[in-house]
């Protein structure tokens, strides 16, 4: 039986390249990207051709309503994909099993990471009303550096220079944006500019940060088992990382009480740290941080004082109507009447 779809390379005009100081007006063509490495498990075979495509960043199965793929310009429906509800459910169960976890009616929402870095989230019916829903976030085949992101249109030359200076100055950074806007990609590229003599420790719920750096230690949280034992939280990992003599401490995404540990670390001499936070806009950030602080038992005034002291610059990213991820602005946290606010920077 043939695959239910055929993956064909998308060819189109490249984004306008950023002409950095001293760069030539034309660049040599980039070598074709490698195929993405995937687990050898047979459960992946129905999707293997699509998941192996280096241009694909995300794949979504919306129950019986179809299969979608994002190649960097928004999700598009994959033609020819037809599965009934039972087969979609079976596929979702199998995809989660590849990551070593169990998906069933008693545990209808599960998140796993495959070997080689793909992140898979699945929800079974009836929680997912239209049938089993699967979301697959794929690691990039080739790690883009800041120059690559500039060529792709994420920022112009002056913004690229500004970003590099923030790393050189050891500013504490918070990268914000909505889902799929390139927060992790930008942060990884920035960390690739850290001097090789410095020790970077990254802490993530699911390890996604891949960095071109010789001294990088990756820590990943662990969910508890069915008996509720064995879990290792992000907050615990932040505390442990402080004992590992980091030159730069990075929290991949602050989603809860770990924000307290990150702010404490950045307020005790660990300059050059960074994290990401989900926020739709720069002006939404204060409310988001207050909500995260509340999960850690911090009141709004404590959050405001800690954030203003710990975070030097906020870098906000978003996706334009054309689907291109861009740096949309810079800001710094400030106190306004004892409450947290942000001041946008020119």
What annotation goes with each model-predicted range?
Residues 211, 241-316, 328-335:
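Conserved P-loop NTPase nucleotide-binding/switch module
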Residues 1-105, 111-114:
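N-terminal accessory targeting/assembly segments
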Residues 175:
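Hydrophobic anchor at the beta1->P-loop junction of P-loop NTPases
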Residues 70, 76-169:
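P-loop NTP-binding catalytic core
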Residues 141-151, 188, 192-239, 285-289:
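P-loop NTPase switch/communication element
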Residues 28-41, 306-310, 321-346:
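NTP-binding/hydrolysis catalytic cores, primarily Walker-type P-loop NTPases
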Residues 183:
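Conserved lysine of the Walker
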Residues 79-80, 147-155, 216-234, 248-252, ...:
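Flexible beta-alpha connector loops of hexameric P-loop NTPases
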């Amino acid at each position: 039986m043939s695959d239910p779809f055929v993956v064909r390379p998308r060819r189109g005009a490249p984004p306008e390249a950023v002409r950095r100081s001293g760069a030539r007006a034309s660049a040599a063509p980039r070598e074709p990207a490698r195929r993405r490495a995937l687990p050898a498990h047979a459960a992946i075979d129905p999707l293997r051709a699509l998941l192996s495509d280096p241009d694909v960043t995300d794949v979504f199965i919306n129950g019986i309503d179809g299969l979608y793929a994002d190649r960097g310009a928004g999700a598009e429906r994959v033609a020819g994909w037809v599965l009934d509800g039972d087969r979609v459910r079976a596929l979702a169960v199998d995809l989660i099993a590849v990551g070593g976890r169990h998906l069933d009616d008693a545990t209808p929402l599960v998140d796993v990471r495959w070997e080689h870095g793909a992140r898979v989230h699945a929800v079974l019916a009836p929680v997912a009303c239209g049938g089993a829903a699967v979301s697959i976030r794929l690691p990039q085949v080739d790690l883009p550096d800041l120059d690559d992101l500039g060529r792709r249109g994420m920022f112009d030359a002056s913004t690229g220079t500004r970003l590099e200076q923030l790393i050189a100055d050891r500013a504490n950074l918070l990268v914000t944006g909505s889902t799929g806007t390139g927060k992790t990609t930008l942060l990884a590229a920035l960390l690739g500019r850290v001097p090789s003599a410095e020790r970077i420790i990254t802490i993530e719920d699911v390890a996604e940060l891949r960095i071109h750096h010789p001294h990088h230690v990756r820590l990943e949280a662990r969910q508890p088992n069915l008996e509720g034992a064995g879990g290792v939280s992000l907050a615990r990992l932040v505390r442990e990382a402080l004992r590992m003599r980091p030159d730069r401490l990075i929290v991949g995404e602050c989603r809860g009480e770990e924000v307290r540990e990150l702010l404490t670390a950045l307020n005790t001499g660990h300059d050059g740290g960074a994290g990401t936070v989900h926020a739709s806009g720069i002006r939404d950030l204060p409310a988001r941080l207050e909500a995260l602080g509340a999960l850690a038992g911090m009141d709004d005034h404590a959050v405001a004082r800690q954030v203003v002291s710990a975070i030097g610059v906020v870098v906000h990213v978003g996706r334009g109507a054309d689907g291109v991820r861009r740096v949309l602005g810079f800001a710094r946290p400030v106190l306004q009447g004892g409450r947290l606010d942000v001041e946008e920077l020119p």
